[in-house]
């Protein structure tokens, strides 16, 4: 057992997801680095995340022209993919128990048009954690203005790629 006078492992202490490292270009933020090329996650682009107090985390996306719809704003599918990923990264930063989860539901309200070129910040709140589920809610802001609100439920599963 570790001596209580030892400094805690920062990555465990702040609730940062496993495998995350401090982002050199954004002090105070963490990242998993680049997602595997050609993966669905890679289409979202670089994700940053950080704890934001007890039960809260923030996840950041950098939308580009690739995330736009034909009307010139961010495509709803790209926004919902980001929110889905933010529930995991932001939820872990908020103190969600470590484990493998799948999304059971995600409800998104589109409040304002998001635009490329300015970061999206998903402010994630862990509302409740049970043995098998995590209940989350949040607001995605761009330039400090709310663009999307969401609620979602994640189900903890026993092993990856196994039936729930």
Residue spans of the language-model regions?
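Terminal targeting signals and extreme-terminal segments of soluble enzymes
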Residues: 1-164
């Amino acid at each position: 057992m570790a001596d209580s006078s030892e400094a805690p492992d920062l990555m465990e202490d702040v609730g940062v997801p496993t495998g995350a490292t401090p982002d050199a270009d954004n002090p105070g933020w963490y990242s998993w680095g680049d997602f595997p090329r050609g993966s669905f996650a890679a289409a979202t682009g670089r994700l940053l995340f950080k704890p934001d107090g007890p039960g809260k985390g923030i996840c950041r996306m950098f939308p580009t022209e690739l995330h736009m719809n034909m009307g010139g704003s961010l495509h709803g599918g790209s926004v919902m993919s980001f929110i889905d990923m933010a529930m995991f990264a932001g939820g872990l930063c908020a103190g969600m128990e470590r484990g493998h989860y799948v999304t059971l539901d995600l409800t998104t309200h589109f409040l304002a048009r998001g635009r490329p070129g300015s970061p999206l910040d998903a402010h994630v709140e862990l509302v409740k954690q049970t043995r098998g589920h995590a209940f989350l809610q949040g607001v995605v802001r761009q330039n400090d203005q709310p663009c999307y609100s969401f609620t979602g439920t994640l189900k903890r599963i026993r092993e990856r790629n196994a039936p729930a």
